[in-house]
């Protein structure tokens, strides 16, 4: 099957309450070779355009407020958004990836996405497994870059994936995690093998997705008030009700994030700390439409030696159980406050 010869890549994302993190996500994926970003602004309180500054040349912002299911029975906001993007200018690029702002594509053997994707001839979609990161013991969001601060994750990859798909091969989008392909196109994993959900040794050695789903304990608990782009309260499946209930959200944190998501130190992304901060500093120098935005100073850059980062001493002091022990104390305090509030509410009924 004859395919497009270039390897241009665009990324599509829904953005809500990501003012502290979106620039890092943009710069990092720009360094990987993403040509353009289509950002769907789902935050009416803080317009995304006020945050972007020098990103405007390679970012298209689409205002995207409202009910996630209005007019789309059975479809969530992500599917509606991605379908809209692919029906528009995203289709002019060879490849498209649908990501969340807490998901970072990681290439272990290639410098750029075009280099990586050039080896996938006659392939319609490449599915990359998640590596799920924990909170590293942070109660509040860490200062600086997410990719530098959060270095602890589950030891095993997640079977869940996100896809990079050829725009000409996509038939429809039925999930936020993959695309349905037209007849004749095939889906592979990062190693070029026919895609299968089962894990095997080396499945993420070439490429994967770092999923920073829990930047801190407070950010995790804030999911309840922020809402979820995948569901509303009337349609959320039973297994996902924790996303919309504070008590269940706390329990989910205790049983999954604090226990399982801080098992292994993975500091691969530290090698990008200097390039990311350098680009952020340069973008700050070119000005921003919001004078209140913080500036990134080159003086704060970390040093690197032959591509291997010099890890600050504070990171070396993390021992395997520290994140879990710190979380335990903070969670108990938060749980006590939650129980007291529930008791007061019941007493007032």
Regions inferred by a protein language model and the residue ranges of each:
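Short, acidic, metal-binding catalytic loop of nucleotide-sugar glycosyltransferases
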Residues: 27-36
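Catalytic-site signature of metal-activated, phosphate-bearing donor transferases
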Residues: 75-80, 107-310
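Short beta-strand/loop segment that forms part of the nucleotide-sugar
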Residues: 35-43, 63-66
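Boundary detector for helix-to-coil junctions that initiate low-complexity/charged tails
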Residues: 300-349
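Cell-envelope/extracellular polymer assembly enzymes that use nucleotide-activated donors
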Residues: 8-10
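Active-site beta-to-alpha loop of glycosyltransferases that engages the nucleotide-sugar donor
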Residues: 13-27, 43
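Active-site-proximal specificity loops/subdomain of glycosyltransferases
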Residues: 47-98
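Short acidic donor-binding/metal-coordinating loop in glycosyltransferase active sites
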Residues: 42, 100-104, 109
